[in-house]
Amino acid sequence: MEWHQDWAFYPYTNDDVLAVGVMLDDFTLDNGPLLLVPGSHKGPVLDHHSDGRFSGGIDPRSLHVDVSTAVPVLAPAGSISVHHARTIHGSDLNRSGQPRGLLLYEICAADAWPLAGGYGPFSDLEEFNARMICGEPTIEPRLERVPVRMPQPRPLDPTSIYNAQKGLERRFFAVLDKP
């Protein structure tokens, strides 16, 4: 999983947006755990395009942060991780032969409305409001001056981040070629 910011996939009207990961398996150094770059959420939103299309990853030449400071998330199955949607993160190859499942949830403030991506389609406000876990529903989004880059044009295969990142010309992490 190349270095990326979740915010690049789903920008909102304000950046009160978090990613919550539930570890379905143990996360160890051998199985390529999630790596988080501390403080990177306070920096710019980096370009996630390659060859004119959104690719879901940052070109290594554009990484203007010291990724050697990245902190591995090491924890047993059942643990959670929480990071800001603008945090630069990624993970190296899983070399352990053991699974490394992570179930990700995106949560945001009630007044953070998606500009692109995010939430998925909803047919009406009732369905939209049913997704609230706390707070009061609102149809008045809070607009803040936050850096936004739109994830357009879409990747050739937008079905997953892994497929989107296949379009990257340059990579930081090694990849396995599977038949």
Regions found by a protein language model. Give the residues of each.
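Short, surface-exposed loop/helix-turn segments at secondary-structure junctions
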Residues: 1, 54-67, 97-99, 117-127
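Double-stranded beta-helix
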Residues: 27-92
